[in-house]
Regions:
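Physicochemical signature of membrane-embedded alpha-helices that form the seven-helix bundle of GPCRs
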Residues: 167-168, 199
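Alpha-helical transmembrane segments of multi-pass membrane proteins
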Residues: 121, 148, 169, 173-180
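Alpha-helical transmembrane segments of multipass membrane proteins
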Residues: 153-157
Length: 223
């Protein structure tokens, strides 16, 4: 599997990188056909903006409590230092993957073949250490959602081949869970948030109805 994904050099006009998926910068376009009577049908792959975009602040809000909690145990400073090193390495790994994507599109990619396995091992070790710190310091429910989301998304950082927006779909259920988790926390802190949460859900459902024809291939009038 690694050999296939690391050596595939094909490109596609609708390809997109992992860092573009949460913001839907490059959706996937499958099919379009003009029908009789001024109608058209098409199939695309993209998400609900109010779900995918809201997932970004939801993830940040979930991670903030982890950063605020302090440990009084002996060696906590060393632990925090190691955790910061792990986070910095994951950021470096993400930036490296962007560089590899660009070099591969220009005919390069030898750097990934040389350093790829080593970076994978360090990336997994850093992620596991950070996960251990979150387990001992944070909310277990929030940790599960963040960990599941990361497991679905982060491996694509290590894939130099062309990728598409639909590779993000397995992460979307956990995005929705993180949004609901944040909504519950907001409502618990202040009941006034309840009506705004209901407005958000109603608008998100409305957008689903609006986009459904171009997601499912339902014929619609061109205008």
């Amino acid at each position: 599997m690694y050999e296939y994904h690391s050596k595939l050099e094909a490109t596609h006009p609708w390809q997109s990188s992992w860092y573009e998926w949460p913001t839907m910068i490059r959706p996937m376009y499958y099919y379009c056909q003009t029908l009789r009577d001024g109608m058209k049908e098409g199939i695309s792959a993209f998400g609900n903006p109010l779900v995918w975009w809201a997932g970004i602040p939801a993830l940040i809000l979930i991670l903030l409590p982890f950063g605020r909690r302090r440990s009084n145990r002996l060696g906590s400073k060393t632990s925090q230092w190691l955790q910061s090193i792990g986070c910095e390495f994951l950021v470096f790994l993400a930036l490296w993957s962007v560089f590899v994507k660009q070099s591969s599109s220009n005919g390069g990619g030898d750097s990934w073949k040389l350093y790829g396995p080593f970076l994978i091992v360090l990336g997994v070790a850093s992620a596991l250490y950070i996960a251990y710190q979150l387990v001992t310091r944070g909310d277990k429910k929030a940790l599960f959602m963040v960990f599941a989301y990361a497991v679905q998304l982060l491996p694509w950082i290590l894939v130099p081949r062309c990728t598409f927006a639909y590779h993000y779909f397995p992460s979307v259920p956990f995005v929705a869970m993180m949004i609901v988790y944040c909504m519950v926390k907001l409502v618990d802190s202040d009941k006034k948030w309840f009506k705004w949460c209901m407005v958000y859900l109603a608008v998100a459902f409305f957008l689903f109805l609006v986009f459904y024809p171009v997601l499912s291939g339902q014929p619609i009038y061109e205008q």
